């Protein structure tokens, strides 16, 4: 689950939480103090999504995408409705988006702090790694719980051990910031970043690529820049574009990745970089990158100049809209108001 928006949400909510009754959370004493880390992928701990709930979530995400292009306040109740019903069926992605809406005040809540913590605790109770990461954020910010950085770090580490890439990057970054003067933690931090990179964390992939350059492993650096570009990181695409460009004495230290000059490869990477940069607010990605600009010695295939994400973004085709009959069935089975997705009898605002 992507969490970049959640951090902004926490900052938005922190003031609102001041003065609220603090909740006690488990101290995770069972989280080992040792630094040793084994790479685990988050997907091993994520339950299969309910197909009908996922239909609701996908339609709500399409509405959200259109909000990014042109905000319409009338869309928010509809989004809340879909997210709430999907969340009731254990949809952990809808859970995150619902919390974000509550935090921004675009979804109704009788008690925003309590509901946000309840939703997060539900993920933890089901062993979903992102729940531990999010609770770590709340502990660090003191949002509805007693501010406790040490305990926050335990929650981050628990999330990292369960495979959450955001937690792996965060903990890994703390360890690599100790610098090479602390070789043990530094090495473990880089292993955490590598694990996050392999799971779709673009920034982790870029930074691990830089570490490979430091170790003079240019082939590995190029591979991780390629991976980061797939995940949507424009810096990685720029690095590869420059790497396939003309290397001079002036730019050698900055651009040389041990690659042979290739003008067409450079052109393609720079085009991709432009899209990733221009649309960064919408989180584009290029999973088909190896079909557009495979690394040498593979030959370049023909390319029409557009990544699939941009084609889909411009087409803006709506996923199937959930029927009212489906919404009513799903909502009533969970004791929710089919019209709002809120608990039956909840006070409306």
Question: What does each of the following model-derived ranges do?
Answer:
Residues 19, 293-349:
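Long C-terminal extensions of eukaryotic subunits of large macromolecular complexes
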Residues 18-81, 89, 96:
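N-terminal leader/linker segments that initiate helical-solenoid repeat arrays
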Residues 98-106, 171-177, 210, 238-249, ...:
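TPR/TPR-like alpha-solenoid helical repeat scaffolds
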Residues 222-234, 241-251, 255-279:
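TPR/TPR-like (Sel1-like) alpha-helical repeat modules
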Residues 1-16:
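Sec-dependent bacterial lipoprotein signal peptides
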Residues 61, 65-72, 99-110, 136-146, ...:
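Short coil/turn linking the two alpha-helices of tandem helical-hairpin repeats
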Residues 49-56, 89-93, 98, 105-106, ...:
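Short helix-capping/linker turns of helical repeat alpha-solenoids
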Residues 72-81, 108-119, 145-155, 180-192, ...:
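Structural signature of tandem alpha-helical TPR/SEL1-like repeats
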